[in-house]
């Protein structure tokens, strides 16, 4: 994993404790307990919200706050006759960050969405980008890379992605904790007001 300065590696229970503390749901006095009589399981609701928050963070937060790995050795690459490379993305990759094929003169950091107007020129042999101005289209489970010169093998120099930790933990930069929604306990969907 890259960019590990000030990175936290938290279990789900450790992250749950952070959320409870930020929301004021953790007693501050040792020996005190909080009990509910309405049957609401606050921990389950917080865990669900916590998982949603982390999934959203992986999809949209700046990559310097998230676990980023080079997955180039885990890609399945296929090249078409027209030089377009299809890369099958490994399941832990949430989103691509920076990719580069060996012959390219620069890397790609903007990944177009299928159907975007900018993709129209990519499939035309006369307007398709080459090694000086490469392009990529992100289909989620596969990425099309435009394009490779004739006779070149599809060899990746890098395929950096934001990755989801396989063990269900939370890996993130400590400053990302500031994005936890802590307005008040009632603002979390489905949580009753705590008195």
Regions of interest found by a model, annotated:
Residues 2-133, 137-139, 145-195:
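Glycine-enriched, solvent-exposed interface loops adjoining structured elements
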């Amino acid at each position: 994993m890259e960019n590990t300065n000030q990175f936290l590696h938290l279990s789900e229970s450790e992250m749950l404790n952070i959320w409870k503390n930020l929301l004021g749901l953790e007693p501050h006095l040792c020996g005190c307990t909080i009990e509910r009589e309405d049957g609401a399981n606050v921990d389950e609701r917080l865990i669900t919200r916590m998982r949603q928050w982390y999934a959203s963070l992986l999809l949209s937060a700046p990559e310097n706050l998230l676990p980023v790995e080079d997955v180039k050795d885990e890609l399945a690459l296929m090249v078409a006759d027209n030089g377009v490379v299809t890369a099958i993305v490994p399941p832990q990759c949430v989103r691509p960050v920076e990719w580069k094929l060996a012959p390219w003169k620069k890397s790609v950091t903007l990944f177009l969405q299928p159907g975007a107007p900018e993709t129209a020129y990519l499939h035309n042999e006369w307007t398709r980008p080459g090694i000086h101005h490469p392009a990529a289209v992100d289909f989620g489970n596969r990425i099309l890379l435009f394009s490779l010169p004739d006779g070149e093998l599809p060899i990746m120099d890098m395929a950096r992605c934001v990755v989801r930790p396989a063990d269900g933990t939370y890996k993130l930069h400590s400053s990302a904790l500031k994005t936890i929604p802590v307005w008040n306990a009632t603002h979390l969907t489905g949580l009753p007001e705590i008195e």
